[in-house]
From Swiss-Prot:
Homotrimer. Interacts with the inner capsid protein VP2. Interacts with the outer capsid glycoprotein VP7. Interacts with the outer capsid protein VP5*. Pfam families: Rota_Capsid_VP6 (PF00980). Intermediate capsid protein that self assembles to form an icosahedral capsid with a T=13 symmetry, which consists of 230 trimers of VP6, with channels at each of its five-fold vertices. This capsid constitutes the middle concentric layer of the viral mature particle. The innermost VP2 capsid and the intermediate VP6 capsid remain intact following cell entry to protect the dsRNA from degradation and to prevent unfavorable antiviral responses in the host cell during all the replication cycle of the virus. SUPFAM superfamilies: A virus capsid protein alpha-helical domain, Viral protein domain. InterPro entries: Capsid_hemagglutn (IPR008980), Rotavirus_A/C_VP6 (IPR001385), Virus_capsid_a-hlx_vir (IPR008935). It comes from Rotavirus A (strain RVA/Turkey/Ireland/Ty-1/1978/G7P[17]) (RV-A). The keyword Calcium applies. One of its GO terms (biological process) is fusion of virus membrane with host plasma membrane. The keyword Nucleotidyltransferase does not apply. GO terms for cellular component: viral envelope; viral intermediate capsid. This is Intermediate capsid protein VP6. Zn(2+) binds at residue 153.
Length: 397
């Protein structure tokens, strides 16, 4: 994989720098690097494809090295160089695609395509440019079973989950109390509601709690916490728990009280925040526990009192909510996030070439299903194919 990255980096730089009119001395270093690539691969043959609808392609290498000149690069020089560079770029692209569409239950971090396995041969180790890519560094570490670390912006660590639970429900469904939530990607919205507005709760205080397990441990996270849950606090028709009826959710928004957010690791509280909104920091955690209260206003104007009667029917739902967003974090496991298109690249290629469902990934690379069952095998394969996708993205920009 590191050889493939070095090839891509060299070819990307060569394509950008070897242009007509450039003084040769300004590009002599990259020309020599390209010549090293040519000398290393000349005489080799490779084959890519042959899975799903991905066509088989045979690659042969017999190129002359790029020459030197005391003058500026002319059109003929650049045209000859581009012919060589473009062929090599097509080859690297095909190797990346061939790697992205393959998976294995055992040792999924290792190259799975014949072409990438062949590039692991010692003769190609002379190809060396710059292996400082975060993905290459982590791939090498994971390959040696050492700790890795990815910096993530809005990590997609939460599987989609939109549901509710009722702690009180009368048969007519006009007097309910419970919580409703939406978890997805890096964001949690949670709302607690009570038709009675805590009228019969102890001390006129209704308490709510929501626990969200992570699928991986996050470290050094920056988190934002805001009152209200705008996606959840709108009028809606909601099915009953048994699915046999529906009820009208008609929220009236109040501000939550006694808000507490706990970040836990293996069941132990690591970081705890009380009555604090805005930007929070969490050292390391694998679950989040959010608790808050709905307090019935002790004093209400006639207009407000009419919203929350003291006897049935109860036409409205007093509602308090919170929104928590994981803005950034580090993780030892590779995840998709807001900064990188690699999940889209991988999914698109597997769909384009009708790659059959294998033993590791779910159909269509369904991210929610993948996270819900994020095994060691999936982690290894995902790290490998995301690394290949990161290399491919360098040369197709």
């Amino acid at each position: 994989m590191d050889v493939l990255y070095s090839l891509a980096k060299t070819l990307k730089d060569a394509r950008a720098r070897i242009v007509e009119g450039t003084l040769y001395t300004n590009v002599a270093d990259i020309v020599q690097q390209v010549n090293q690539v040519i000398n290393s691969i000349n005489g080799s043959t490779f084959q890519t494809g042959g899975i799903g609808n991905l066509p088989i392609r045979n690659w042969t290498f017999d190129f002359g090295t790029l020459g030197t000149t005391l003058l500026n690069l002319d059109a003929n020089y650049v045209e000859n160089a581009r012919t060589t560079i473009d062929y090599f770029i097509d080859f690297v692209d095909s190797v990346c695609v061939d790697e992205i569409v393959r998976e294995s239950q055992r040792n999924g971090i290792a190259p799975q395509s014949d072409s990438l396995r062949q590039l692991s041969n010692a003769k190609y180790k002379r190809i060396n440019y710059d292996n400082e890519s975060e993905y290459i560094e982590n791939w090498n570490l994971q390959n040696r079973r050492q700790r890795t670390g990815y910096l993530l912006h809005k990590p997609n660590i939460l599987p989609y989950n939109n549901s509710f639970t009722l702690t009180r429900s009368q048969p007519a469904h006009d007097n309910v109390c419970g919580t409703i939530w939406l978890n997805n990607g890096s964001e949690i919205e949670i709302a607690g509601f009570d038709s009675e507005c805590a009228l019969n709760a102890p001390g006129n205080i209704q308490e709510f709690e929501h626990v969200v397990p992570m699928r991986r441990v996050l470290n050094n996270a920056t988190v934002s916490l805001l009152p209200y849950a705008p996606r959840l606090t709108q009028r809606a028709v909601i099915p009953t728990a048994d699915g046999l009826n529906t009820w009208l959710f008609n929220p009236i928004i109040l501000r939550p009280n006694n808000v507490q957010v706990e970040f836990l690791l293996n069941g132990q509280v690591i970081t705890n925040y009380q009555a604090r909104y805005g930007i929070l920091a969490a050292r390391n955690f694998d679950s989040i526990r959010i608790s808050f209260q709905l307090v019935r206003p002790p004093n209400m104007t006639p207009g407000v009192a009419a919203l929350f009667p003291v006897a049935a029917p109860f036409p409205n739902h007093a509602t308090v909510g919170l929104t928590l967003k994981i803005e950034s974090a580090s993780c030892e496991s590779v995840l998709s996030d807001a900064n990188e298109p690699y999940l889209s690249i991988v999914t698109g290629l597997r769909q384009e070439y009708a790659i059959p469902v294998g033993p590791v990934f779910p159909a269509g690379m369904n991210w929610t299903e993948l996270l819900n069952n994020y095994s060691a095998s999936r982690e290894d394969n995902l790290q490998r194919i995301f690394t290949a996708a990161s290399i491919r993205s360098m040369i197709i920009k």
